[in-house]
């Protein structure tokens, strides 16, 4: 492709609102253009990258036995009402009416649509298992779109759905798709980790995320320094502490702590280690008017996903109102504790072996020092309430945990019968008896993969594309292409020979200054660059550099095609 026939639109500066490297570089490199908040046009250069990702995904989906179809973006409300997600999904689901006043939505996922298709088309165990996928535009009305295509309202996603006669069959396909995802992200050249994950609003049982490792990632993953264990921090369990509880050394003393409402201010006021404090979180129970007290160490981070799964806790997790707290505890938040509280109390595992805690006294502006479980209040039920921290024992018993940030680019779920039961997706088994199908779903955020790859592969000059994702494999940068016959002839010859060798080549024949052409080639991140100029040609050479190391070297003009093709095929 010649640049004069293509479209290249680069910027020297990124817009002020762009925070992430990927957002800045995608705008500067002209991969995307913003149309509105969270809405982008994929420009020709960006679309080539998107298509490269899609091609890898399609090849691996076919290898895994998934069949491609294409479902609609606009979906009828009755399917979502049937599954129960019409109301549950909330405002992220963009709802609309047609001219006949019928309700529809812009699909953020397609579980309902594919379930409806399958229940109409498959009725026998002989037709199972089946695995379908499509690559389609999705829409989620994000309350605050940000970070470019990383969290846009409109995005491209590959979602696959499998249907099975039994759970064993689902597990087999789940593993096949898990393996396919590993191959996809490996082929794309990304550093990633599959991690055990929460199922979230999709539902079901087993679930894994595929996280591209990047310091800018919104997610935190925990992994063992010894084994293959890895999980999203939301799911990684903490283990009960071993050994005996420390002996109580202090008496229970009520201390006046005026205007002390936070753990940090308590630590400063009493000049104590934060590890000796307990913080109180009050949530609603399943029964009307019931409150449940949750206790964890002051330096630990509360995990609401774990808390929501506790017996007796209302789902979804609901924090108690200030009025309800005052009514049952006699104090406001910031001064709460278990002493005198008659309701259910859960305490985190990390508090079980400790003694002489500092905790709220259930009286405004007062705390207790020297608090001990069993002596000053009934023994709570010790459970897992917190996020893991670095150095915690790995849940598999092998090694210690480390933490890293990641960007979720893929997610696989064992949905089981969450949707098939609600929508009566059934089949006749080999005994002629009607059974509900087992279901799995498997998603990859195609547009997010592009942004995540840039987060992982960039420098101060621009993008550094991996081999599989680059919009072009090679860029030829001729100096004075329009004015120098020698340069033009050499550039055209190398261009033709590389095309004949099967390379994906961009010949930048734009009438621009040398500095613009060179800067654009680095900004665009094309892996291999050949610079052709009159001075080097007089010595029989061209300049060759790989974008990842940017070390330019003189290569004989008669050897450059072989040199580049060898690198491409390595």
Curated annotation (Swiss-Prot):
Localization, UniProt: Cytoplasm
Annotated organism of origin: Neisseria meningitidis serogroup B (strain ATCC BAA-335 / MC58)
Any Pfam family: tRNA-synt_2b
Name by which UniProt lists this protein: Proline--tRNA ligase
Keyword Oxidoreductase belongs to the record: no
Record text about domains: Consists of three domains: the N-terminal catalytic domain, the editing domain and the C-terminal anticodon-binding domain.
Oligomeric and partner information: Homodimer.
Entry's Gene Ontology BP terms: prolyl-tRNA aminoacylation
GO cellular component term, pick one: cytosol
NCBIfam families: PRK09194.1, proS_fam_II
Key words, A-Z: Aminoacyl-tRNA synthetase, ATP-binding, Cytoplasm, Ligase, Nucleotide-binding, Protein biosynthesis
Reactions that this protein is recorded to catalyse: tRNA(Pro) + L-proline + ATP = L-prolyl-tRNA(Pro) + AMP + diphosphate
Family matches, as InterPro entries: aa-tRNA-synt_IIb, aa-tRNA-synth_II, aa-tRNA-synth_II/BPL/LPL, Anticodon-bd, Anticodon-bd_dom_sf, Pro-tRNA-ligase_IIa, Pro-tRNA-synth_IIa_bac-type, Pro-tRNA-Synthase_IIa_type1
Entry EC no(s): 6.1.1.15
Domain of life per record: Bacteria
Gene3D superfamilies in UniProt: Anticodon-binding domain, Bira Bifunctional Protein, Domain 2
PROSITE patterns, alphabetized: AA_TRNA_LIGASE_II
Similarity annotation: Belongs to the class-II aminoacyl-tRNA synthetase family. ProS type 1 subfamily.
One annotated GO molecular function: aminoacyl-tRNA deacylase activity
